Structures are given as C-alpha cells and as structure tokens.
From Swiss-Prot:
The lineage of its organism: Bacteria, Pseudomonadati, Pseudomonadota, Betaproteobacteria, Neisseriales. It comes from Neisseria meningitidis serogroup B (strain ATCC BAA-335 / MC58). This is Glutamyl-Q tRNA(Asp) synthetase. Keywords: Aminoacyl-tRNA synthetase, ATP-binding, Ligase, Metal-binding, Nucleotide-binding, Zinc. GO terms for biological process: glutamyl-tRNA aminoacylation; tRNA modification. Its EC number is 6.1.1.-.
C-alpha cells in the first residue's frame, strides 16, 4: 500500500514552499488511495522556534489537510536511531571521528553538498586525541555510483566517495544527523513514496546507500521544483519567506495549484474541497522540473 509523508521542521512556520510540498505529497498519496503521514523533524532543539510544531499542525488543519495516524516526533524516537547505529557498528560500516570541523575542512575540496570529508579518521592510527570529547560517528561510503530514477527530475546519481565523502550519522554534540534519522523513520513507518523539495535531491543517494546497508526497502522519490523569490533565491526561513496567512487559504491553495500545473479549480470557500479537487486532478507528469518564481 502507498504510504507517503510530510515532514516539516519546527525551526519556523510554514510558508508557500511548505504548502507546495504538503499539497503535492498529499495529492499524490490520496490519488493512489494511500496513507499520508505527518512527521515532525525536531532533531535540532537549539534551532527550533518555540510553539512552531503546534502552529504547523494547526495550519495544516486550517488548510483542510487530514493525516493518518498520530504525528511522529523525531525527538521521541532516539531509541530507534540508537538501534540503527548499533546495527551499522556491528556490520563494521561506521567509525568514530575525532576531527573538529575546522581541522578536517582545512584544505578539503568542495563536493556536491559542501566539503568532502578527507577520511582522516577512517584509520585508527590517524585519529587525533579526543581530549575528553565525544566523537561523531561517520559511515564509510563506497567508491561507486549510486543512482535512481526520480519521479519528476528523472535520472540522478552520485559517486559518494568523490561527491560527498564519509558522512556523519551522530554528531559530536550528541544530536542525531538528518540522514540516519530520516532513513530509520521511513523504514519503520513503512513509507513507500517520498514527495519533497529538490533541495533534498542531493541527500537522496546517501539515504539510498543507508537503506542498502540496513537492508530496508528504498521508497520511490519525486523531488518538487523549488519556489524562488525575485532574486532567484529559494523561498525559505533563511530568505524570510512570509508565514502562510490563514485569512488567504483559498488564494494560497490556488496559487500552489498553478505552480503544480493543475487546471483551474472551481469556486469554493472551503479549503478541504479544493484539496479534494486537487487529488481528483493530480498528474505528477505535469509538475515542472525546474524552479518556479513565486513573487
């Protein structure tokens, strides 16, 4: 059975880009007769906005979304992540990293998603002294291509050794890294389809590699076009994207429908009816492959 999900982070309030992802993931799930889950990705408490999680849920309800089951909170799932890391330790796939970011980034080359880790701590004899600090934990990556067929973008691939390097699963400050948490959650929740923004496309080969290491199914992925402002920047909390105005729910839904190339919806003042209409007319093949300007 199709199981999709929407996984916001409570570092801020929902904005127009969030709404596009919510609509697309919801419409794709419901159009396939599937489930749509909500998962709150609250992995980084220092960056979270107080009250954002409850505000996000209230906003989704106000826009007519109905999800299946209880909301999952990553902050309550640490035991699952610890179990997942233990499996990788047992398989000999991970190692402690004693490097500070400043140390390992000095002289490092840039890859697909920031600097490529140079593998300094792969070999025990080369690891610097801990000096009383906890290590991060990294996973060894293979020198081979990992690719997949995306439902919107098409073919996408990376050589993890060349483009990414061994990446962190547990940070030195004790917080779980996104890549491990999302793979563990998707597997445990039975997620079969992931519809999300293209800013996460670069993360997908890492997640597929983790799925292979853990012998869990790889979901089908579809990465949506990013919404950009007039300066070509992705609308996000960092670019001061305005929070969704609950007094303009119908207008904002229609705006998102246009970005997703849905036909014009009939007049109604009920957001839930607009969502039902989007489900009935959903066509992933019409979704643009490239960024869309949303002034």
């Amino acid at each position: 059975m199709y199981t999709g999900r929407f996984a916001p982070s409570p570092t801020g309030l929902l904005h127009i880009g969030s709404l596009l992802t919510a609509v697309a993931s919801y419409a794709d799930a419901r159009a396939h007769g599937g489930k749509w889950l909500i998962r709150m990705e609250d992995l980084d408490p220092p960056r979270e906005m107080p009250g954002a999680a409850s505000h996000i849920l209230h906003t989704l309800e106000a826009f007519g979304f109905e999800w299946d089951g209880e909301v999952a909170y990553q902050s309550r799932r640490y035991a699952l992540y610890e179990e997942t890391l233990c499996r990788l330790k047992t398989a000999g796939l991970v190692y402690p990293c004693h490097c500070s970011r400043k140390d390992w980034q000095a002289g490092a080359r840039r890859g697909a998603d920031g600097f490529v880790y140079n593998g300094r701590c792969r070999h025990p004899g080369q690891r610097p002294a801990l000096q009383g600090k906890q290590p991060a934990w990294r996973i060894r990556v293979p020198d081979r291509i990992i690719g997949f067929s995306d439902g919107i973008v098409g073919g996408y691939a990376q050589n993890l050794a060349r483009d990414i390097g061994d990446f962190v699963l547990l940070r030195a400050d004790g917080y779980w890294a996104y890549q491990l948490a999302v793979v563990a959650d998707d597997a445990e929740q039975g997620v079969t389809h992931i519809v999300r923004g293209q800013d996460l496309l670069v993360s997908t080969p890492r997640q597929i590699y983790l799925q292979q290491c853990l012998d869990v199914p790889t979901p089908q992925y579809a990465h949506l076009p990013l919404l950009t402002n007039a300066q070509g920047q992705k609308w996000s909390k960092q670019t001061l994207a305005p929070a969704l105005d609950l007094n303009r729910r119908e207008q904002l839904l229609r705006q998102v429908f246009r970005y997703l190339k849905l036909p014009e919806a009939p007049e109604t003042d009920r957001p839930a009816e607009l969502l039902d209409w989007a489900v009935a007319h959903w066509d992933m093949d019409k979704v643009p492959k490239h960024a869309v300007t949303a002034p």
